Design a protein with these regions (language model features):
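Short linear Ser/Thr-Pro motifs
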Residues: 10-12, 139, 284
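Helical "lid/coupling" subdomains associated with nucleotide-phosphate turnover
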Residues: 17-20, 40-71, 79-129, 144-146, ...
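N-terminal glycine-rich anion-binding loops that anchor highly charged ligand groups
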Residues: 24-36
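Membrane-embedded alpha-helical core segments of multi-pass
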Residues: 135-137, 209
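Acidic, divalent-metal-coordinating active-site segment for phosphoryl/phosphodiester hydrolysis
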Residues: 138-144
Length: 365
């Protein structure tokens, strides 16, 4: 069985095609196009025509690669920029026509869950509680979990693209602009960092482009073996400031498209290290696309992890499953009468709501 995950991210659009073999997902091909969607928001909060066209042209090329695949084997998702843009629906409708499949705009917590799931399958099995930090173009997901299950997760509205555009828009880098970028990123975490601070987890990992790029640069400069520490980040920050301009940033292994947003990414990562009191962070493969693939595979094989989470909660609190099923059946029948063309996914959410409602009633007795 072949599956495809399409990630309409704030920095880049990505496609991952994989096949399912037993419990394993094996990648057959991956494609990435740097779009910088987050840099294409105008002063009124709308995606500019230029940004939309960049994205739609990339999706047309992606559509060629998924031609012939069953539509229910494909999941396309949008993240923070498409959550925030006032005219995102206009873009989504055009994107769906090109891809010939639904584009789902992920809520922040769902994005965090999928990020953790993708990383958890890529990392060695462990009983330790893990922190995953994923710095994207316009948001940063912080997630704590164990095994393959998220315990706590949130998406913060700060990323490498929007930070770079705001604080290094003239392409100049100074100690002052870097410090402002770090303080701004840290302020976004204010009030929520206590949930993710050291003491709530045993191991810290980072995923996606910023963390991977920083790890590679630190290893190439022989500052570390690829592990990331605050001391190493401060050294890298000083080198970037010394370059004085985005155009003059040069490190072995640094790709051109990553250079554009490296300063913003470093600022966000330093803020995360300071606020969450991280000593050392290692790189985790996986992240959102792999989380989508494993989630999709679970649904196709009737092993949806969300179903398992609801069932575990009902069992833990001895909820009345028969009563929950009766309520769920009535709710779904009413829903299908009112919305005959609604998807099975919508009906599934209603059943979970009935299950969790019954669990809540059990707790309150």
């Amino acid at each position: 069985m072949k599956l495809a995950a399409i990630d309409l991210g704030s920095n880049s659009f990505r496609l991952e095609i994989a096949r399912v073999e037993g419990e394993r997902i094996i990648t057959e091909g991956s494609w990435k196009e740097t779009i910088r969607l987050a840099a294409g928001i105008d002063k009124d909060g709308n995606l500019t025509p230029e940004a939309q066209n960049r994205g739609l042209n990339a999706l047309a090329r992606i559509a060629e690669k998924i031609r012939g695949m069953p539509r229910n084997h494909i999941r396309a998702v949008g993240t923070q920029t498409l959550r925030a843009a006032k005219n995102s629906q206009e873009f989504i409708e055009r994107a769906e026509k090109i891809l010939d499949c639904k584009v789902e705009i992920l809520r922040g917590k769902e994005e965090a869950r999928l990020v953790f799931q993708g990383c958890s399958f890529a990392l060695p099995p462990s009983d330790e509680t893990r922190l995953i930090v994923d710095i994207g173009g316009a948001s940063t997901e912080c997630v704590i979990g164990r095994g393959h299950e998220m315990i706590e997760g949130e998406s913060f509205h700060v990323g490498c693209v929007n930070t770079s555009v705001t604080f290094f828009k003239d392409r100049k880098i100074t100690a002052q602009s870097m410090e402002r970028a770090i303080l701004s990123a840290a302020s976004v975490l204010d009030g929520s960092e206590y949930r993710f601070v050291k003491g709530n987890w045993q191991e810290a990992f980072g995923s996606s482009g910023t963390v991977s790029a920083v790890s590679s640069i630190l290893a190439a400069l022989r500052i570390t073996d690829g592990s990331i520490t605050l001391y190493a980040l401060e050294q890298l920050k000083d080198k970037v400031i010394h370059a004085e301009s985005i155009d003059k940033i040069k490190f072995d292994g640094l790709k051109e498209d990553r250079r554009e947003v490296l300063a913003g990414g470093i600022a966000v990562l330093i803020a995360v290290f300071k606020k969450l009191k991280i000593d050392v962070m290692k790189v985790a493969d996986g992240a959102l696309r792999y989380g989508i693939l494993y989630d999709l595979a679970g649904r196709k094989l009737q092993r949806d992890p969300r179903e398992a989470s609801v069932e575990r909660m009902m069992n833990a609190f001895h909820a009345d499953k028969e009563q929950a099923k009766r309520v769920g059946d009535i709710a779904v029948n009413l829903f299908k009468t009112m919305s005959p063309h609604a998807s099975e996914d919508s009906a599934r959410f209603l059943r979970w709501a009935a299950d969790l409602h019954e669990t809540g009633l059990t707790l309150s007795r």
